[in-house]
């Protein structure tokens, strides 16, 4: 499979998983993170979404130093999106560890949610800027 085809599959998968993780985030926010199933679903979706983000970056940059590559980008929004993603991921891992050990929600989870919503807003802008890709790849 050609790299462009892999990127197409990855981008469409990111779009779908991004919508699902956003819906899961809104549901958790609206219900105050009640119930164990919605939290585990959000964790599973987060793992899938994160794996797809790393795959997407890999398809663009291979294994070159990603931090150096992001610093050289012309578009500051893409750089911002990368750092917001990393911050959301780190806070999500910390909140998950706290939740699984203390069986209680921590303020880290709240911060993770707020930063995550900001990241998703930037991701939506990032996607809209590249909407031609999605329009040209409906096959």
Task: State each model region's role.
Residues 1-139:
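Membrane-embedded alpha-helical bundles that constitute the cytochrome b-like, heme-associated redox core
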């Amino acid at each position: 499979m050609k790299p462009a085809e892999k990127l197409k599959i990855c981008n469409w998968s990111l779009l779908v998983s991004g919508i699902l993780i956003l819906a899961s985030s809104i549901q958790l926010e609206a219900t105050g993170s009640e119930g164990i199933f919605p939290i585990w679903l959000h964790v599973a979706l987060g793992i899938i979404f994160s794996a797809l983000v790393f795959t997407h970056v890999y398809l663009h940059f291979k294994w070159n130093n990603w931090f150096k590559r992001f610093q050289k980008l012309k578009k500051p929004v893409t750089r911002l999106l990368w750092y917001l993603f990393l911050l959301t991921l780190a806070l999500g891992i910390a909140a998950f560890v706290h939740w699984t050990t203390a069986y209680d929600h921590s303020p880290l989870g709240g911060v993770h949610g707020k930063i995550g919503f900001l990241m998703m807003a930037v991701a939506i802008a990032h996607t809209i800027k590249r909407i031609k890709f999605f329009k040209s790849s409906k096959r």
